[in-house]
């Protein structure tokens, strides 16, 4: 295992700036020492770990002795140690867990519960916690060897994406946040993003620059769209923010930070990226402020389009950036040195001149360092992938080398699919964190690349001249695919690749509380299918039920059915394949993402259901069973849609009628299926939004935000739907029945009418109707959707399997 000292030596050798260490060019060692100095006392961290144990296993609160140890006891880095407790008497602690921070203690506890007690921890919405397998106090499994010693091969385990706060956390109160921070500690996360409540800080800062509340009403986005307002993609959409919201979120942030710190985590706070209210132009007419281009509005509506960016080279940028950092310190205390800033994310500099780019980067960092002399810039590396035509090696080097060595850390955001580290000479000497992106928009889709997750961090760390300093998870939305996140978290403690096949057997046994051969066989299939995506395609869920294609079937005619430019689809329940042919043209038939054999996954579902009588009491089993049934049926619906469009092109009105009814029936059946699990309900999302409201106006606004984000997302007009519609689609009961079903019905009715009347399909008419339907649904507040499941999930899944795959 490579030690941190070796990594640091390599960092020094390849440093662009200097081959010697000085107080002006600190190494990662120096940064870690300074961050350690900000941590609370050992007793505080031990108390936090004991509190977690009490919440997780209240019956075993006296069964474990938890202690903080120094890094020297771990060879100079972070670690946890699990030993048998050999105290006097037979009553009291049985297991001793030691760690360098509260996070390491929690990680050690989790490791022991997983690998000695077959326990399992996942998000509540993915089945929750399974600790029934833990033996009673006095009978805990002993450690066979002298001890279990696990040392971090890299110092950091990073967590969150800048948009997770909107897709997943937006409606959370402290009770839910407490469970999340516990989950984070158990997974070993020690470098989490902490973006909640920053609008209250900005209000105080901008007040010093004569920006009024009314100006900020046009600047802040609504609760469900704050992430994109913060990035300068939009303004005012879904707003304004009430005083209640600002005050409550700031209070919540202080609770979040307090708990993170007690565990020994280092929170990453926001910094100034240059995004400013439009009113600043009038107050500072000489300032170098640029209006940005349209970001995804349908017609450039100035009410929310085209935000303003203060150029980093302007002295006002430094002044505002310094004020923001200092205001956070005043509110929260000296709790971190690491700040996130993504000035250039989806915001290409006006020139590719390396000197200019270097000057911009230096200015961004100067604003941070004026506010905190020890500031370190944490930057998402998404721009190097999404805008690779601009960010060539000269531009990349110019930005990465614009700050002192050791003062920037890059997130290799999409490393499990499109790593940058191996194409950029390890970010030209800049420390980076290997990250898994995995999820977009909080979509619900069984998907992953487990082999890449097992091997990627290890390959990066042991590669020549490695500058890797962490493993991270940067999903846009959480509470899906728990297997992916458990493995990724574990890789922060693994110095070698994991045998995924063996690991999954252990995972299944832990997750369902017992060994079951059908389940093991099912997971073997899932490992090689849904969790083995290697096509390099970003998995935005494009299943046609939740993202009905805005496609004009009249654009394809019978003559287009040629073998040229064709593709394969798997048709219906017949578990065979036939060729459906469409010529590649501008209005080509939409294709949902499919990277595996549907036949094999149907077999995995059969195995899952065979195990149902043995595992039906397990909430984790029920969640996975419902999710797998949904996955199978959604892919079948994609095939049915394709066959329906083919029937339309062939003017086969009889087949079109039958296939369209089958598609609609699938939506209804899937709604019933999803209604049988508490974790798949629209009502939970809507009610959590309304629960935060303090009055009727807020209640209406928050519900509109919640409804809009998961459907139309952004602005539209009478004839043009939002460019981001269905980006955050969800397979939730209630949403299928009341939104996706009527939309699909409108679409197929227009197709049938077109054939009956022998007229061209009027795509504009259908668009107008479904946009009107969507607006009405978004603005509605009369329906109250269930927050509790109904129906027997196992019986429903078995019925649907026999119905569609007899």
Swiss-Prot record:
A GO biological-process term: positive regulation of cell division
EC id: 3.2.1.50
The organism's place on the tree of life at top rank: Eukaryota
Signal peptide: 1-23
Keyword RNA-binding: no
Glycosylation: residue positions: 210, 288, 422, 465, 532, 720
Catalytic activity: Hydrolysis of terminal non-reducing N-acetyl-D-glucosamine residues in N-acetyl-alpha-D-glucosaminides
Entries under SUPFAM superfamilies matching the protein: (Trans)glycosidases
Coiled coil regions, renumbered to chain: none
A GO CC term attached to the entry: plant-type vacuole
Alphabetized InterPro entries for the sequence: Glycoside_hydrolase_SF, Hex-like_dom2, NAGLU, NAGLU_C, NAGLU_N, NAGLU_tim-barrel
Keywords, sorted A to Z: Glycoprotein, Glycosidase, Hydrolase, Signal
The protein's enzyme class: hydrolase
MF GO annotations: alpha-N-acetylglucosaminidase activity
Phenotype upon gene inactivation: Embryonic lethality when homozygous, due to embryo development arrested at one-cell stage.
Keyword Hydrolase: yes
Family from the record: Belongs to the glycosyl hydrolase 89 family.
Protein function: Involved in the remodeling of the N-acetyl-glucosamine residues of proteoglycan complexes during reproductive development. Is essential to promote the first divisions of the zygote.
Name of the molecule in the record: Alpha-N-acetylglucosaminidase
Organism: Arabidopsis thaliana
Lineage: Eukaryota, Viridiplantae, Streptophyta, Embryophyta, Tracheophyta
